[in-house]
């Protein structure tokens, strides 16, 4: 289906100001049309569908009641922001979502005044909203002005400690601040579900008696699935020794639960809060992820992240796979190893599917732990599992491991505990852009004493590295691998345990050595082929380890070649810097060795395809070829420059 939906009312909305002249009934119609437009757009671009569909009515209500952009609506994670972008002057570009030079899939300050605070990681919204509230009261100035600050945060994000740190501070300061808890019951599952005991208590204190009266029947007004969710939470509250909810004990006035899809409930509550709130308020709205689009509602992940799809059937249009994904290779290999070793267990932070641990969880649920959005806790939990004699694999995206870095240092590395870090989404990741790039883990992991750091050049190497990590008990060990499909190499039947700190020579050559760390090896080999056509035959090597370095191999490469170039999918300070330190310590530079290190540039690279992103970073085969020609001084003058990115 290619026809766009008919949206006569939505067509009249150029900015949120246009919503204010509409009746409540018309706002409800706008919400209906906005939902259809969101589905249509994401069917073309792919992206986070379910989250946006769950907040359509809330988005319309917020922008119609509050005075954005003076009032700051801060979307936690912000993957639910597509309807928000449509209403805030970006509808004409909505079908460029997550594409090169298109709209970001998240809120972004540089994109619109209606995006006051960028996001993509979870649980930051309340801290940001509190900051805006304090800035307002201290006389801070922005171009749009400073009014109310409204944080919209999901139940999953509320499982992170940062959200409660912010609420604790907000309650102490007592500033006028509005938090909307978007409870779609998707993320608070039994393993991380203690918080769910607090998610339903009607507000009982002045000055909101009118709200209490309005909300008294709210549970009975909810659709059956929501009534059950509210009942579940209220039942769990009965045994509490102290009165009031957790939110009230933190200093927040609590309103709810209300049906987050019912404009007749949303609009009066928001209008009353806007008119009368004096301190921090939490509004508990119960919603349904994927609301209004049956294929998303019935999907296992409620349409959390989709490829392009057919609007009628919901069938996703995924390109045929030529090789297994790195994530699936990790998950399958770990599960197979767990069958042989009962001490192997796994920890992830709200990403069992994304990290491939769903395979392990299905077969060994008692040894697989989803700790929720709690990377700090997850790392320390894994550290103590290791101290207790288990073999924990802590599987996290590179970008999210950053959130638990102090624990990596303090609880794992200093104690030399054998935690195995499986670092997924290493390097540039494509459509999710800079916020999800795994650019820094080589540097921040390899700088830690006693940490072993590996990078897989292909899916077969990853299989070996999982086995190597399982066999290594002398201290912490990490291995990194990218998003997406492998290289299509032949997979070994059984993994091999690699010798720690030993790389491999792929192709013997002369004059220049290309030393790759990670999956740039494929591009290095393409560059070597192009160079061979010019009469230059480089040596190609796969380092495998950034720490400990293969000292013998690196010094041999330096001795036998006039130039040595390292290539890695990481920021400066990583593998190449460690190689340079070794060469410096051994006085190799004194002999005249020409050394270059190809790393990601010192900038944040916006979303595009991975190939386009690596082109922008000057890290693809033609750039490697140009670097060799330049360092050897054999390029013509017009070939000395790197290809335009």
UniProtKB/Swiss-Prot annotation:
<dbReference type="InterPro" id="IPR005475">
    <property type="entry name" value="Transketolase-like_Pyr-bd"/>
</dbReference>
<dbReference type="GO" id="GO:0008661">
    <property type="term" value="F:1-deoxy-D-xylulose-5-phosphate synthase activity"/>
</dbReference>
<dbReference type="InterPro" id="IPR049557">
    <property type="entry name" value="Transketolase_CS"/>
</dbReference>
<feature type="binding site">
    <location>
        <position position="184"/>
    </location>
    <ligand>
        <name>Mg(2+)</name>
    </ligand>
</feature>
<dbReference type="InterPro" id="IPR029061">
    <property type="entry name" value="THDP-binding"/>
</dbReference>
<dbReference type="Pfam" id="PF02780">
    <property type="entry name" value="Transketolase_C"/>
</dbReference>
<dbReference type="Pfam" id="PF13292">
    <property type="entry name" value="DXP_synthase_N"/>
</dbReference>
<dbReference type="GO" id="GO:0009228">
    <property type="term" value="P:thiamine biosynthetic process"/>
</dbReference>
<dbReference type="InterPro" id="IPR033248">
    <property type="entry name" value="Transketolase_C"/>
</dbReference>
<keyword id="KW-0479">Metal-binding</keyword>
<keyword id="KW-0786">Thiamine pyrophosphate</keyword>
<dbReference type="GO" id="GO:0052865">
    <property type="term" value="P:1-deoxy-D-xylulose 5-phosphate biosynthetic process"/>
</dbReference>
<keyword id="KW-0808">Transferase</keyword>
<dbReference type="GO" id="GO:0030976">
    <property type="term" value="F:thiamine pyrophosphate binding"/>
</dbReference>
<comment type="function">
    <text>Catalyzes the acyloin condensation reaction between C atoms 2 and 3 of pyruvate and glyceraldehyde 3-phosphate to yield 1-deoxy-D-xylulose-5-phosphate (DXP).</text>
</comment>
<feature type="binding site">
    <location>
        <begin position="156"/>
        <end position="157"/>
    </location>
    <ligand>
        <name>thiamine diphosphate</name>
    </ligand>
</feature>
<feature type="binding site">
    <location>
        <position position="155"/>
    </location>
    <ligand>
        <name>Mg(2+)</name>
    </ligand>
</feature>
<keyword id="KW-0414">Isoprene biosynthesis</keyword>
<protein>
    <recommendedName>
        <fullName>1-deoxy-D-xylulose-5-phosphate synthase</fullName>
        <ecNumber>2.2.1.7</ecNumber>
    </recommendedName>
</protein>
<keyword id="KW-0460">Magnesium</keyword>
<feature type="binding site">
    <location>
        <position position="293"/>
    </location>
    <ligand>
        <name>thiamine diphosphate</name>
    </ligand>
</feature>
<dbReference type="Pfam" id="PF02779">
    <property type="entry name" value="Transket_pyr"/>
</dbReference>
<comment type="pathway">
    <text>Metabolic intermediate biosynthesis; 1-deoxy-D-xylulose 5-phosphate biosynthesis; 1-deoxy-D-xylulose 5-phosphate from D-glyceraldehyde 3-phosphate and pyruvate: step 1/1.</text>
</comment>
<dbReference type="GO" id="GO:0000287">
    <property type="term" value="F:magnesium ion binding"/>
</dbReference>
<feature type="binding site">
    <location>
        <position position="375"/>
    </location>
    <ligand>
        <name>thiamine diphosphate</name>
    </ligand>
</feature>
<comment type="subunit">
    <text>Homodimer.</text>
</comment>
<dbReference type="GO" id="GO:0019682">
    <property type="term" value="P:glyceraldehyde-3-phosphate metabolic process"/>
</dbReference>
<keyword id="KW-0784">Thiamine biosynthesis</keyword>
<dbReference type="InterPro" id="IPR009014">
    <property type="entry name" value="Transketo_C/PFOR_II"/>
</dbReference>
<dbReference type="InterPro" id="IPR005477">
    <property type="entry name" value="Dxylulose-5-P_synthase"/>
</dbReference>
<dbReference type="GO" id="GO:0016114">
    <property type="term" value="P:terpenoid biosynthetic process"/>
</dbReference>
<feature type="binding site">
    <location>
        <position position="79"/>
    </location>
    <ligand>
        <name>thiamine diphosphate</name>
    </ligand>
</feature>
<feature type="binding site">
    <location>
        <begin position="120"/>
        <end position="122"/>
    </location>
    <ligand>
        <name>thiamine diphosphate</name>
    </ligand>
</feature>
<feature type="binding site">
    <location>
        <position position="184"/>
    </location>
    <ligand>
        <name>thiamine diphosphate</name>
    </ligand>
</feature>
<dbReference type="InterPro" id="IPR020826">
    <property type="entry name" value="Transketolase_BS"/>
</dbReference>
<comment type="similarity">
    <text>Belongs to the transketolase family. DXPS subfamily.</text>
</comment>
């Amino acid at each position: 289906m290619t026809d766009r939906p008919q949206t006569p009312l939505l067509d009249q909305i150029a900015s949120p100001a246009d919503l204010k002249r509409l009746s409540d009934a018309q706002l409800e119609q706008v919400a209906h049309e906005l939902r259809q437009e969101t589905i249509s757009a994401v069917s073309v671009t792919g992206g986070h569908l379910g989250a946006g569909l769950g907040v359509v009515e809330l988005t319309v209500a917020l922008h119609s009641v509050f005075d954005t952009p003076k009032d700051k609506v801060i979307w936690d994670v912000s993957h639910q922001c597509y309807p928000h972008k449509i209403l805030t002057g970006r509808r004409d570009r909505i079908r460029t979502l997550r594409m090169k030079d298109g709209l970001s899939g998240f809120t972004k300050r540089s994109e619109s005044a209606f995006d006051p605070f960028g996001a993509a990681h979870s649980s930051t919204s309340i801290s940001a909203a509190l900051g805006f509230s304090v800035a307002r009261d201290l006389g801070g100035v922005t171009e749009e002005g400073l009014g109310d600050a409204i944080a919209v945060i999901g139940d999953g994000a509320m499982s992170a400690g940062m959200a409660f740190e912010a609420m604790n501070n907000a309650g102490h300061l007592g500033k006028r601040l509005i938090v909307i808890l978007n409870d779609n019951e998707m993320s608070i599952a039994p393993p991380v579900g203690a918080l769910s005991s607090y998610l339903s208590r009607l507000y009982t204190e002045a000055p909101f008696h009118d709200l209490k009266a309005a909300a008294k029947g709210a549970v009975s007004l909810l659709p059956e699935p929501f009534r059950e969710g509210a009942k579940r939470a209220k039942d769990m509250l009965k045994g509490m020794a102290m009165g009031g909810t957790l939110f009230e004990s933190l200093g927040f006035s609590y309103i709810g639960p209300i049906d987050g899809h019912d404009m007749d409930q949303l609009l009066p509550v928001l209008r009353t809060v806007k008119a009368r709130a004096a301190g921090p308020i939490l509004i508990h709205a119960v919603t349904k992820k994927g609301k209004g689009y049956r294929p998303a509602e019935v999907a296992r992940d409620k349409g959390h992240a989709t490829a392009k799809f057919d609007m009628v059937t919901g069938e996703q249009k995924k390109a045929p796979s030529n090789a297994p994904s790195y994530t699936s290779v990790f998950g399958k290999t770990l599960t197979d190893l767990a069958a042989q070793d009962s001490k192997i267990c796994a920890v992830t932070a709200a990403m069992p599917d994304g990290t491939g641990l769903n395979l392990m969880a299905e077969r060994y649920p008692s040894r697989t732990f989803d700790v929720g959005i709690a990377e700090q806790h997850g790392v320390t939990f894994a550290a103590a599992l290791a101290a207790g004699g288990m073999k924990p694999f802590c599987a996290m995206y590179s970008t999210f491991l950053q959130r638990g870095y102090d624990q990596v240092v303090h609880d794992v590395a200093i104690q030399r505990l054998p935690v195995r870090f499986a670092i997924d989404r290493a390097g540039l990741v494509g459509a999710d852009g800079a916020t999800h790039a795994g650019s820094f883990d080589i540097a921040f992991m390899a700088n830690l004493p006693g940490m072993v750091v590996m990078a897989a050049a292909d899916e077969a190497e990853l299989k070996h590295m999982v086995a190597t990590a399982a066999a290594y008990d002398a201290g912490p060990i990490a291995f990194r691998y990218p998003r997406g499909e492998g290289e299509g190499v032949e997979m070994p039947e059984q993994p091999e345990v690699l010798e720690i700190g030993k790389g491999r020579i792929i192709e013997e050559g002369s004059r220049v050595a290309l030393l790759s760390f990670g999956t740039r090896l494929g591009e290095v080999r393409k560059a070597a082929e192009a160079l061979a056509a010019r009469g230059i035959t480089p040596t190609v090597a796969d380092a495998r380890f950034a720490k400990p370095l293969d000292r013998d191999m690196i010094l041999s490469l330096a001795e036998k070649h006039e130039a040595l170039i390292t290539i890695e999918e990481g920021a400066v300070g990583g593998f190449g810097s460690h190689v340079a330190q070794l060469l410096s310590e051994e006085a190799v530079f004194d002999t005249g060795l020409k050394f270059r290190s190809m790393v990601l540039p010192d900038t944040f690279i916006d979303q595009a395809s991975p190939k386009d992103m690596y082109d922008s970073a000057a890290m693809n085969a033609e750039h490697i070829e140009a670097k060799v020609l330049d360092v050897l001084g054999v390029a013509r003058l017009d070939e000395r420059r790197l290809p335009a990115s």
